């Protein structure tokens, strides 16, 4: 916790009285005032009650522990407590209250006295601490030594060292009768090791002498026809399945872990795990903390991972392993000790990864059993005592309390049952009721409500516990001391103590009485933070807001002296500290009141959305609203409507109209008019201010709420005016909004487009871009505009020179497989900042061309227009890389691509008629190496053209004598082979033809001779 400490002068007045506050005294200022009225008779009271019926709650209404009852609005100014001098006089401490320490000592004596009274007639002695003891059952057989104790509904079950099982039943509240006393095994006196209740299947597992038997509840007798499991060292619950209505149980055997499934009518072995020699265990689903051969281990049954940990005893002394759950999700608590039970020990919290967390808790002796009742650890000593330690490593002294006995060893147990303590005295309960009843801070004669609040505390009061301390002298409840009696100091150190306690309460399900106590602690925490912190506008105010659903935040307004609407109530035990805080000048603790109020407002609005706040939310908000508005108006700071509630609007408008600065507050006024449904007034304000962007946004957001006459007659003019007043940065957004509004208002967009003046070319282009092209004329209009922009950019940005550099770079690259010239220029343009604007409009033209690719007229139009500004065919190549044949001959295209050294594109136009010519041009390249590579690639990639003898000979003739033949020897060989194959094929054909003619002549002669 961060506490800001300063010594500035403005906090001096606050500091003077800090040490003089006490929480509780004999009577509150309101009680002292009401003493004057004690002589009034009952009939007058009844009359007053009827007269104040607006303050009385419905008698049939259910009173909830977590919600304050609400009263009719009553300003503080009407209360006698608003007189500051009177309040200060009533808050002056008496001589007995000169410092807070006296209060603490008195409280401590009261606690000790309470414990002393409890010890009378009890066989236990308990030191001062967070728990008290209360006898549950004192007539157990004293000749037995008990090993375990469990409770189920109205039944108590005991196990002993001699194998006895005792069953007690509660006949009436606090009166138990021994129902049965039987032996686990009639032939054995072995001790009962464990009673594990399975309440959801009305069963219990009894472990005795390594034998596990399933009992039925509440009869507490063995279930018939159920297998007895032998060789079991320990048994723990894995979980309960709601679907199968069965418990999954781990039973630990020397030969491994058995997974049992126990339902109301069966016990089934479902699985076995090969983890042997486990003595004791605790389970979190598939994660086990186990003891084995004087050491602890973590086992994950799902992954079969084993994490060895540390030894149970530093020596080979046979100490019983201590394993329990620190919390039910991810942490275990184990103990490690020295050589014996009387030597010191450590309690260690270990997570599922085997890491020791939360520090080390030092125990004075090695325990026989440990229960975690966070934030306490209750240890069963081997020396007839139970020791209670703090589970918080920050505690200076971790040993908080001890319980001793004159009987046999004390045992501890945490039962499934929750018991209610009924043994406290009326004086003790009266003290609690007096502290926790609510009393009005603003003066009220609502005596019925006051009595009802006290009755509510009395009805809610209960002390519950599931902790049991027992031995042969009886069974006793270990009861936590009521929190309201444990926190009585006004010292600053109490803040941390209360915060720790509230964190603990947040982790458990609270009873109705615990809810009341929690609210009391929250109130006390807020008052102490307000008292001791030098600056309260941040952390303290945030805490007030966090607790606003439990503590009436109007108490804070009361302490600041602000006007408070409706009646506010506070715990009687805290009235004095509230009144004395009110006498201090708390504004000295705030550096920025505005910031504080705004933070509170925002936090409370969030809370209100969850439905957690009271019905007085509107009264709380109104107090803050007007204060915030006036302070901000004085400082000329920004004011927004989300700072105010609807009830404050009219007053805020009046405040603004009192000043001449209405227009600077236009946003606030517009938002207020919107909330009030006066939309045309808001439009007029925006029009007068010339804020057309906000105007169109307002129309879009509120179109359905605007009058029909405005939409028919005025809306188009406002929208057009908005577009004409916009700039390039806001134009696109404005047009989108206008188009959306036109759709919403069912206004024809072309009609609106025709209203745009001819001189507003740029606006018309932007509108068509957003609207989308409707016809060919729109396309031509846009293309001419884009092309004009391109021409302008080319001239202004020296684009031809830049493109020339790109082309030179491309031509100087003689790699045959390089990309084509069009793609190369695209890439260069994309990465050139100088060409960014050129690329922008090029893409617009290209997109427009693509959208109209099936419109031949438009495509021809674009080619003609681009050709007018083109140089060296660069633009036509960019725009029409695949369509140029529509306007340019193949021969011309070949020349164009050859001029750029675009070798791949050249191939598209190569044939037998020009192959040799292209080859000659490649040979003319100055570098022989490049020429060789180009010619080689040319011939290889066009080998299919070399099927003619003439062209083969021309190729061979064209190759110069200086040409390194070895580089194309393979290619030449293929040419020669192809030539030879063709020659041989020709000769073969001639020979075959000659033979065929000869055969034909022979057949003809034979035919003639026969005829």
UniProtKB/Swiss-Prot annotation:
Give the family per the record.
Answer: Belongs to the VPS3 family.
Q: Where is the CNH domain?
A: 143-418
One GO cellular component term, please give it: early endosome membrane
Could you share any additional remarks the record makes about this protein? Present with 2270 molecules/cell in log phase SD medium.
Q: What is this protein called?
A: Vacuolar protein sorting-associated protein 3
- What superkingdom does the record give? Eukaryota
Q: Where does it localize?
A: Cytoplasm
InterPro entries listed in its UniProt record: CNH_dom, Vam6/VPS39/TRAP1
Q: Name one GO biological process term.
A: vacuolar acidification
Q: Where is the composition biased (Basic and acidic residues)?
A: 1-48, 63-86
Q: Please give the organism.
A: Saccharomyces cerevisiae (strain ATCC 204508 / S288c)
The segment annotated Disordered runs over 1-100
UniProt keywords (A-Z) are: Cytoplasm
Please explain the role this protein plays, according to its UniProt record: Required for sorting and processing of soluble vacuolar proteins, integrity of vacuolar morphology, efficient segregation of vacuolar material into the bud during the cell cycle, acidification of the vacuolar lumen, and assembly of the vacuolar H(+)-ATPase.
Signal peptide residue numbers: none
UniProt feature, compositional bias: Polar residues: 87-100
The reply on keyword Cytoplasm is yes
Disulfides per UniProt: none
């Amino acid at each position: 916790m961060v506490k800001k400490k300063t010594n500035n002068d403005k906090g001096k007045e606050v500091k003077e009285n800090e040490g003089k506050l006490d929480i509780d005294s004999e009577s509150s200022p309101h009680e002292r005032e009401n003493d004057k009225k004690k002589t009034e008779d009952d009939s007058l009271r009844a009359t007053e009650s009827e007269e104040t019926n607006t303050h009385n709650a419905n008698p049939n209404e259910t009173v909830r522990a977590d919600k304050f009852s609400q009263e009719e609005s009553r300003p503080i100014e009407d209360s006698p407590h608003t007189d500051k001098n009177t309040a200060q006089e009533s808050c002056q401490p008496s001589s007995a209250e000169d410092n807070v320490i006296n209060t603490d000592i008195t409280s401590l004596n009261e606690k000790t006295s309470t414990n002393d009274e409890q010890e009378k007639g009890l066989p236990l002695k308990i030191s001062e601490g967070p728990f008290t003891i209360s006898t549950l059952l004192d007539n157990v057989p004293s000749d037995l030594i008990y090993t375990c104790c469990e409770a189920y509904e109205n039944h108590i079950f005991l196990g002993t060292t001699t194998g006895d099982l005792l069953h007690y039943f509660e006949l009436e509240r606090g009166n138990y009768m021994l129902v049965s006393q039987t032996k686990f095994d009639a032939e054995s006196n072995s001790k009962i090791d464990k009673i594990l209740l399975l309440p959801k299947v009305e069963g219990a597992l009894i472990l005795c002498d390594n034998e596990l038997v399933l009992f039925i509840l509440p009869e507490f007798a063995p279930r018939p026809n159920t297998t007895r499991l032998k060789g079991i060292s320990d048994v723990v619950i894995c979980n309960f399945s709601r679907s199968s209505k069965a418990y999954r149980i781990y039973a630990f055997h020397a030969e491994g872990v058995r997974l049992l499934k126990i339902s109301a009518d069966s016990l089934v072995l479902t699985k076995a795990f090969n983890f042997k020699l486990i003595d004791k265990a605790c389970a979190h689903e598939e994660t086990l903390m186990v003891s084995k051969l004087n050491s602890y281990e973590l086992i994950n049954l799902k992954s079969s991972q084993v994490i060895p940990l540390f030894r149970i005893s530093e020596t080979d002394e046979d100490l019983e392993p201590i394993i329990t759950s620190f919390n039910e999700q991810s942490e275990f608590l184990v103990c490690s000790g020295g050589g014996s039970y009387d030597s010191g020990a450590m309690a260690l919290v270990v997570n599922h990864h085997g890491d020791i967390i939360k520090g080390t808790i030092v125990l004075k002796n090695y325990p026989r059993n440990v229960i975690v009742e966070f934030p306490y650890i209750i240890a069963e000593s081997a020396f007839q005592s139970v020791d209670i330690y703090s589970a918080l490593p920050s505690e200076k002294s971790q040993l908080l309390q001890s319980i001793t006995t004159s009987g046999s060893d004390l045992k501890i147990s945490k039962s499934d049952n929750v018991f209610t303590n009924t043994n406290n005295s009326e004086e003790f309960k009266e003290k609690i009721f007096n502290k926790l009843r609510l009393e009005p801070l603003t003066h009220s004669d609502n005596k019925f409500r006051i009595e009802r609040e006290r009755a509510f505390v009395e009805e809610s009061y209960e002390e519950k516990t599931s902790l049991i301390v027992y031995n042969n002298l009886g069974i006793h409840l270990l009861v936590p001391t009521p929190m309201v009696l444990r926190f009585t100091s006004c010292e600053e150190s109490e803040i941390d103590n209360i915060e720790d306690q509230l964190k603990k309460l947040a982790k458990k399900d609270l009873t109705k009485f615990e809810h009341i106590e929690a609210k009391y602690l929250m109130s006390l925490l807020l008052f102490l933070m307000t008292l001791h912190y030098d600056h309260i506008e941040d952390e303290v105010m945030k805490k007030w807001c966090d607790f606003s659903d439990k503590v009436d935040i109007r108490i804070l307004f009361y302490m600041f002296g602000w006007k408070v609407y409706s009646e506010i109530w506070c715990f009687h035990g805290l009235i004095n500290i509230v009144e004395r805080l009110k006498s201090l000048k708390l504004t000295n603790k705030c550096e920025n009141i505005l910031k504080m109020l705004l933070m509170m407002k925002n936090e409370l609005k969030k809370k209100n959305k969850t439905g957690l706040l009271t019905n007085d939310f509107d009264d709380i908000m109104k107090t803050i609203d007007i204060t915030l508005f006036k302070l901000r108006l004085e400082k000329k700071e920004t004011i927004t409507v989300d700072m105010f509630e609807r009830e404050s609007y009219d007053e805020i408008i009046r405040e603004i109209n009192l000043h001449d600065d209405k227009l600077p507050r236009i946003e606030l006024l517009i938002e207020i008019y919107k909330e009030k449904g006066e939309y045309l007034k808001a439009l007029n304000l925006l029009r007068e201010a010339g804020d057309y962007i906000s105007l169109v946004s307002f129309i879009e957001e509120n179109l359905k709420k605007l009058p029909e006459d405005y939409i028919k007659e005025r809306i188009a003019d406002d929208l057009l005016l908005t577009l004409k007043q916009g700039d390039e940065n806001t134009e696109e957004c404005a047009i989108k909004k206008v188009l959306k509004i036109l759709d919403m208002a069912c206004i024809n967009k072309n009609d609106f487009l025709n209203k745009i003046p001819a001189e507003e070319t740029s606006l018309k282009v932007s509108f068509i871009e957003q609207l989308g092209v409707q016809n060919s004329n729109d396309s031509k209009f846009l293309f001419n505009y884009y092309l004009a922009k391109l021409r302008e950019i080319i001239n202004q940005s020296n684009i031809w020179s830049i493109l020339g550099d790109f082309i030179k770079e491309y031509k100087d690259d003689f790699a045959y497989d390089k990309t084509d010239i069009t793609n190369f220029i695209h890439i260069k343009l994309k990465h050139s900042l100088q060409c960014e604007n050129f690329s922008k409009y090029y893409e617009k033209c290209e997109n427009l061309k693509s959208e109209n690719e099936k419109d031949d007229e438009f495509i021809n139009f674009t080619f003609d227009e681009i050709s007018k500004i083109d140089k060296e065919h660069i633009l036509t190549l960019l725009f029409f890389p695949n369509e140029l044949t529509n306007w340019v001959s193949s021969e011309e295209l070949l020349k164009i691509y050859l001029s750029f050294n675009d070798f791949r594109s050249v191939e598209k136009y190569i044939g037998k008629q020009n192959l040799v010519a292209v080859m000659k041009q490649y040979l003319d390249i100055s570098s022989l190496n490049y020429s060789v590579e180009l010619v080689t690639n040319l011939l290889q990639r066009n080998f299919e053209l070399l099927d003619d003898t003439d062209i083969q000979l021309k190729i061979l003739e064209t190759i110069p004598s200086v040409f390194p033949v070895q580089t194309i020897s393979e290619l030449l060989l293929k040419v020669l082979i192809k030539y030879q194959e063709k020659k041989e094929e020709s000769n073969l054909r001639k020979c075959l033809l000659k033979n065929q003619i000869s055969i034909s002549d022979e057949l003809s002669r034979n035919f003639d001779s026969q005829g």
